[in-house]
Every structure is written in C-alpha cells, then in structure tokens.
Amino acid sequence: MSSRKTHRAVVIGAGIGGLTAAVELAARGIEVEVLERAPSPGGKMRQLVLDDRPIDSGPTVLTMRWVFEQLFDSVGETFDSQLSLEQAEVLARHSWRGGARLDLFAEVARSADAIGDFAGAKEAARFRAFCDRARATYETLEGPFIKAREPTPLSLTRKAGIKGLGDLWRISPFTTLWSALGGYFKDPRLRQLFGRYATYCGSSPFEAPATLMLVAHVEQEGVWLVEGGMHALARTLEACAKRKGAAFRYGSDVREILVEHSASRGVVLANGERIEADIVLANADVSAIAAGKFGASVAVATPPVAPKSRSLSAVTFSMLAKTDGFPLTRHNVFFSTNYRREFDEIFGAKRIPTNPTIYVCAQDRGAVWRQSNDNAVSPERLFFLINAPAVGDMRTFGTEEIERCRDHILDLSQRAGLILEPTATAITTPQDFNGLFPGTGGALYGQASHGWNASFTRPTARTKIPGLYLAGGSAHPGPGVPMAAMSGRLAAASILEDLTSATPSPRVATSGGMSMA
C-alpha cells in the first residue's frame, strides 16, 4: 500500500479540506501530521460555548451528503454509522417587512404550491422552470468543473464536446444571477430570495454569474441537520483520520513553510520547532500564503487576492435568547427592503449595510415543519449573521457600529413578529475573522465569484512550488462545506498521483479515490 520510502505529509489546518485530505492520505499509507493552531478541528466550522451550551458559529447548512459518503466508502468505512443526520423538511423560512412569509421545502412540488399561495400560479410555474434550469446547470458543471482537478474554460468546452456546447451556453456564464432571475420571477421578493444564493459563495447576486443558480438544485437535493451540530462533522472526520493513522497537534501555529532546492521540505512552528516533510498541504486561505504569512519563500506559490476581489465577511451574534411570536424553523431569513443598496454598501462603500438582511439559525429547532413555537427550548441557541465587507485588516468596527447591528436585528425581528430576550451573546466582526484567518481581511469565502471567469481563477491543488499543495474553500472548487471537502479530496488525489509518478516501484495505491471525470 505504500512505497519503500514512507512519505510524510504535514497538513496545515484542520478545516474540512485538511481533514478530508488527511483521511485520504493516511488511508493510502502516507504518514500524516495535522497541525492546527486552534484547540479543536473544524476551521470556520467552529463552536462557541455560552453558559455551557455549544452554538454552531460558522457554516450551518449541510448539503451534498454524498461527498462524505463517497469519502468514507473510499477508505472502507460507512459515513452513516459515524454520524447521525436528519433531512430537513423545510429548507428555510423567509420573511419580509409587512408580515409576508414563505417556506421552501425539500419537495419541489410542495415549494411550488407554497409559492403559488404566496405569489400566484404563474410564479409557481416559473419556479418549476427555474428548478429545471438549476438542475441542468448543476449537471452540466458537475463532472467537467466541480469534480475536475484543474478545470479551465478550454477543458470545460472540450469535455462538453460538440453536443454539449448548447448546454454550456444555456448555463449563461456571461449573465448575472440577478439578471437571469428576472427572466423567471416577476415578484421582486422571489428574485431576492433566489438571488441570496450568491451569498453562499460570498458574492453579490448583481455581479455573480447565473451559474450560481445551481445552489438551488443542491439544496433541493437535501439539506441535512447534524446531531450534535455541524462541529460534530469535523470531529467525525478527525476520528476517521486518526483511525487511518493520522496524528493531530492542536495549539500548533505554523510560522513558515520551508523551501529548499525550490521544493517544500516541511514547516517551522511559532515556537521554533522544525518539522520536516516531503509533502505540505496548506488548508489555509490562499491570501495568507500570498501575503507572506507562511514566509516570503512561498508567497509566490499562489496569486494574491486583491482586497477589492475579496468575498463577503460577516458580523455574527451567537446568542442564547428567549423567543416569542414568529415561529422559527432551523434556517430563517429576514430580508431587507433594498437588496441592491445592501450589496452596494458592502462591495462599493465597504461598510456594514444600513438595512441588512438577517440570517438566523435556530439550533434547537428540529427537521419537522412547524407553524408554532410549541415545545421550543428556552432560552434558545441562535446564530445571527449579517453580511459585511472584508476590511478587517484595514479598520476596526467600533462598539457603536456593532450595537447598531444588534439593534437592527432586534428591530427587524420584532417587525416580523419575533420577540427576542437575549440572555448571553458573543459577537464576531470582520476584524475578529481576520484574526482567526490572517491575510483575509475577514473574507469567509476566498475570492468573490464576480464575473464569468472568477471560478477559473481560484487556485487548484498544485502550486508553483513542488511538494506544496492547497485545499480549502478559497481553492477550487470553491467555498461551502461539501466543496471544501471536495478540495481536500482533489488535493489528496493530486498528491498521490505525483508520488506515483515520482516513485517507479512499488506504486502508491490510489484505488477508491475520487473520480476525476
């Protein structure tokens, strides 16, 4: 299962990309050591504890379950036996000023009925047409782009072939998501609802390509609630990697990636300890590498992300609160009254929006659809998120500004009928996120997906420095929990392929790895 020489890999960061790569590499006979400066795994998938109650304070939506099922299958394990998941009956509950409310469901037919009641039969029919296009967009891009190791516009066209050129044209890469949605929905609230999917990639619907409508299809394929919270997924991946032989060291801050004879040779920790390795996988934001956070010698490994090209950051409130009135479900969205202004303020003026949309994850609400607050836990664990500019390395967000955000949350919630009585709150700003993820300004999704070519400019696993590889949401195929996991698998596949080509005999096993069709 391994070559005569035992290859050693150091993984910098125990985020989802680093964890999946560690599972793959350790299972194939590579000696793996994961170095993480935080006290626990997960990266952005973090938990904060208030009054002894853990609150997911990072990604809260799990889709594309098959990514993790395939990972565990590839190393001889079963994902379902390691983690308990429940499919959400309602994808999200959406609210607008004036009391209008719309639920989207796991079943397209049920969502169409809800949209019909909300906005009329014609909008319901347009929704079905939109779903068809979202599915076609995903199916067109899944193989030649999402699962491809190093996609380019040329490779995408070549893999599509002459018969597939029409499909590529129909995904409308040169049209913005907002413009494309206008061709489907006449009700501005529905355009706003589905335009929000651009924020899943840290982007503006007014600048992101129409291809991002594929997110709608991904959600319709299933949104899953994780027993124990999203952080339990990180712990499950960590446990699997350990069973395969990977070692983990927490509280280990990497100061430098070593480069000798033009190739990576290991790392140096903040305490001066040198760890040698012939493979270094950086599960860190690519901006940190380009900014020299791991040493000047590796800054050339990947192109920098200009501050103007950064994705969204956020102001988040992890909260325990008594609730009354509005019946929260697991995922809730309270929309602003002027969506274009909201994104103009974030990406143009570089300030927190005056009237932002609010996302709320009510973590004590289950998967079953309810229209009442019966059996609600009190106080509830709530996670509020407001999109913000990634300028955490340029300015400080003062107390007055953050208090204004908090007041807006309470006011907008109350206008929708939700009464909140917070008992404990932890706040995270773009400045805090920049501290957690240096070199990013607090950007949470890498580079913004603005323009048709943005997705192709994300770096792939291989870098300009032999032996140094990348994984994570800022690398290909992009942000989000399943995509970050796929980036780890793609990186592991690239590493194994390179080791195989460099080692004549015996070969490093790659069976069961991710298909790169």
Report each predicted region and the residues it spans.
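N-terminal glycine-rich phosphate/pyrophosphate-binding loop and immediately adjacent elements
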Residues: 4-140
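A glycine-rich dinucleotide-binding beta-alpha-beta segment and adjacent secondary-structure elements
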Residues: 187-201, 355-359, 418-477
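Structural core of flavin- and non-heme-iron oxidoreductases
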Residues: 1-34, 38-40, 45, 115-116, ...
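Active-site/ligand-binding neighborhood in enzyme catalytic cores
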Residues: 135-244, 251, 440-441, 445-449
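C-terminal segments that line or cap access tunnels to active or ligand-binding sites in enzymes
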Residues: 322-434
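Active-site-proximal substrate-binding core of FAD-dependent oxidoreductases
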Residues: 259, 496-517
